[in-house]
Curated annotation (Swiss-Prot):
Catalysed reactions, as listed in the record: (2S)-2-hydroxy-3-oxobutyl phosphate + 5-amino-6-(D-ribitylamino)uracil = 6,7-dimethyl-8-(1-D-ribityl)lumazine + phosphate + 2 H2O + H(+)
Family per record: Belongs to the DMRL synthase family.
Catalytic center residues: H88
Subunit structure: Forms an icosahedral capsid composed of 60 subunits, arranged as a dodecamer of pentamers.
A GO BP entry: riboflavin biosynthetic process
Coiled coil (residue ranges): none
Pathway info: Cofactor biosynthesis; riboflavin biosynthesis; riboflavin from 2-hydroxy-3-oxobutyl phosphate and 5-amino-6-(D-ribitylamino)uracil: step 1/2
Organism: Bacillus amyloliquefaciens
Highest taxon above the source species: Bacteria
Keyword Transferase on entry: yes
Protein name, as recorded: 6,7-dimethyl-8-ribityllumazine synthase
Gene: ribH
Amino acid sequence: MNIIQGNLVGTGLKIGIVVGRFNEFITSKLLSGAEDTLIRHGVESNDIDVAWVPGAFEIPFAAKKMAETKKYDAVITLGTVIRGATTHYDYVCNEAAKGIAQAGTATGVPVIFGIVTTETIEQAIERAGTKAGNKGADCAVSAIEMANLNRSFE
């Protein structure tokens, strides 16, 4: 049996990151976690490009555009959606998730889902580097692994 898996060495990888500006006090921490983790795994800082968009709903569009350039070995998406009093949360979360998944499958470039979806602002803060770790850092590790896995299929 052959086991195919990606390693966690970022040397030589070019990574795109799309970040939603809405709830920027949280998404900026997700971005810092992602950048720090990428660099610690060997990705050069000048091989990381960041595109800011208004919010989570716009992330799939920019992620797909980045992936279509074929300049990136992986694209990380980072955003925060916090439930409010209306159904807006459900629409944004569902469409962002679908769009991010489609961006990866349509382009053949790994597109990593890093939208923090929570019931409360406290839960979002916890996932941006406090009690529950940093989702941006987790996504960076996934991006490195998937980029290397994708290379193994070429």
